[in-house]
Structures are given as structure tokens and as C-alpha cells.
Swiss-Prot record:
Protein location: Cell inner membrane
Family annotation (CDD domains): PBP2_lipoprotein_IlpA_like
InterPro entries, per database record: Lipoprotein_NlpA
Lipidation (N-palmitoyl cysteine): 24
Native source organism of the sequence: Escherichia coli O157:H7
Record's keyword annotation contains Cell inner membrane: yes
Database matches in Pfam families: Lipoprotein_9 (PF03180)
Family that this chain belongs to: Belongs to the NlpA lipoprotein family.
Keywords: Cell inner membrane, Cell membrane, Lipoprotein, Membrane, Palmitate, Signal
Signal peptide (residue range): 1-23
Residues lipid-modified (S-diacylglycerol cysteine): 24
A Gene Ontology term for the protein's cellular component: plasma membrane
Lineage of origin: Bacteria, Pseudomonadati, Pseudomonadota, Gammaproteobacteria, Enterobacterales
Protein name per its UniProtKB record: Lipoprotein 28
Length: 272
């Protein structure tokens, strides 16, 4: 049976229920405590710096809840298991709100993490051969983002009027007959070692685990004026809460900007 995103969300939610709900069924009502969802790895390392700033400047206790991928943080925030999350850009949030009926809002910008094309087989766009396989993210917003990046490099042409959410069906010209392989974002770094994959388009969030630098090691990369700035997200009913405001101010601090520059090898651009 084919597993849909709905099935994956439901199954993963059961596995993580003990983590999210142990000891407390809802997010904190204490204005000096906040529970924030983050993606494991480099983004959590950045959030740890914001956590320290929040404690030192505001006396705010930040509890970070780590996730291995992007399927669950919005579920947990919408359900009240988290106060906020920090892992996504605005188009991803808008798509998730529309698909799942969430009442989530952006409360402030964090960083632009440029998406880029990586390869262990080639060094330049000119070396991409006829019929090459290009792996891209499979969630709607990052899939569209990857296709727009391929179009920017003149590798494909997309149907006009599709905005930020084109799909592979909107490719109108593919002069090198590229084979597009759609995978979950967290899987993409691993396919760099797959002999069948020539290029993988990967977000900074996931490329960090490989030790590669978006600026120095990519074959091609997004412009820094990308519309895909990441955001801190909360619910409609707590977007103005003092703990949310203080965490945002802590995240948008010089200390966090400096840490992110180091952690992401120059691949994190402050968006505030």
C-alpha cells in the first residue's frame, strides 16, 4: 500500500507521543517558560544559543524539542504541545496551513538558508550530462523552490504563472532530458553517494550534516534575496504572548547571528 503524507504524519506522531506529551499534555502557560520545536542538528545548535540569550536577557526558560524532519513540528504547535517552532520558511507554512487547516502564523524572521545543488561527480552546471538524474525535495514548497532554482540555471523552463509552487508537471522545456527524482528532504544528503544520482538539490538545514558549505561546495546556489526566509511560528492565540516575543528577540540577536555564521559555514543570512 502506498504511504501518504497523512499516514506518515500519523505514524510518526504515535512514535513521538511519549517525547512530546511526557509529563505535560499542553504547551507551557508560564510566561517565563516556552517550549519550541526545532530540527535536530545545526538548527538546534543555533536555537541553543538563542536559549542561552533568552535566559540571560529575559530570565526566560526555553525548552527545545528536537525533530528529525519537517512533518511534525506544525502538528505539535497547532495542537498546543509546543508554544512555537522555528524550522520553516513562509511558503512552507502557508502550504501546511492550507493543507491541514492549521491556525499558525509567522511572528518574525530568522535566517535565509540558501538552497543549492550539490554533487560528488561534477563541479559546474556545464558538466551536467544529457539524461542526468537530479534529486529534489518532495514537499510542495521545497519541490517548487528546487524547480525554480533549476530554471534559474537554465536547465529547465517552467509554465508561467505558477508562482512559488510549480511541480514537475509544469516543466515545459527540459533540453538535457533531466530525470527528476523526488525524495524527503532529510534523505537527500545520502543520495550524494548514490551512483545513479548526479546532482541533489538540498537545503542548508540538511546539507550541514555532510560538512559541505553552501557557498564553497555547491555546483549552483540560490541568490541571497530569496523569498524563502525562515520564520518563528506560533498559533493565532499565542502570537502576542510575552514568552514568544522574548524568544523572537533572543533569536534575532547578534549572538545568534554570529553563531549561525559559524555553524552553517557562512550559509545562514540574517533575515531581520
Amino acid at each position: 500500500m502506498k504511504l501518504t503524507t497523512h499516514h506518515l504524519r500519523a505514524g510518526a506522531a504515535l512514535l513521538l507521543a511519549g517525547v512530546l506529551l511526557a509529563g505535560c499534555d499542553q504547551s507551557s502557560s508560564d510566561e517565563k517558560h516556552i517550549k519550541v520545536g526545532v530540527i535536530n542538528g545545526a538548527e538546534q545548535d543555533v536555537a541553543e544559543v538563542a536559549k542561552k540569550v533568552a535566559k540571560e536577557k529575559y530570565g526566560l526558560d526555553v525548552e527545545l524539542v528536537g525533530f528529525s524532519g519537517s512533518l511534525l513540528p506544525n502538528d505539535a504547535t497547532n495542537n498546543g504541545e509546543l508554544d512555537a517552532n522555528v524550522f520553516q520558511h513562509r511558503p512552507f507554512l502557508e502550504q501546511d496551513n492550507q493543507t491541514h487547516g492549521y491556525k499558525l502564523v509567522a511572528v518574525g524572521n530568522t535566517f535565509v538558508f540558501p538552497m543549492a545543488g550539490y554533487s560528488k561527480k561534477i563541479k559546474t552546471v556545464a558538466q551536467i550530462k544529457e539524461g542526468a538524474t537530479v534529486a529534489i525535495p518532495n514537499d510542495p514548497t521545497n519541490l517548487g523552490r528546487a524547480l525554480l532554482l533549476l530554471q534559474k540555471e537554465k536547465l529547465i523552463t517552467l509554465k508561467e504563472g505558477k508562482g512559488l509552487l510549480p511541480t514537475a508537471l509544469d516543466i515545459t522545456d527540459n533540453p538535457r532530458h533531466l530525470q527528476i527524482m523526488e525524495l524527503e528532504g532529510a534523505q537527500l544528503p545520502r543520495v550524494l553517494d548514490d551512483p545513479k544520482v548526479d546532482v541533489a538539490i538540498i537545503s542548508t538545514t540538511y546539507i550541514e550534516q555532510t560538512g559541505l558549505s553552501p557557498v564553497n561546495d555547491s555546483v549552483f546556489i540560490e541568490d541571497k534575496n530569496s523569498p524563502y526566509v525562515n520564520i518563528l511560528v506560533a498559533r493565532e492565540d499565542n502570537k502576542n504572548a510575552e514568552n514568544v516575543k522574548e524568544f523572537l528577540q533572543s533569536y534575532q540577536s547578534p549572538e545568534v547571528a554570529k553563531a549561525a555564521e559559524t555553524i552553517f559555514n557562512g550559509g545562514a543570512v540574517p533575515g531581520w
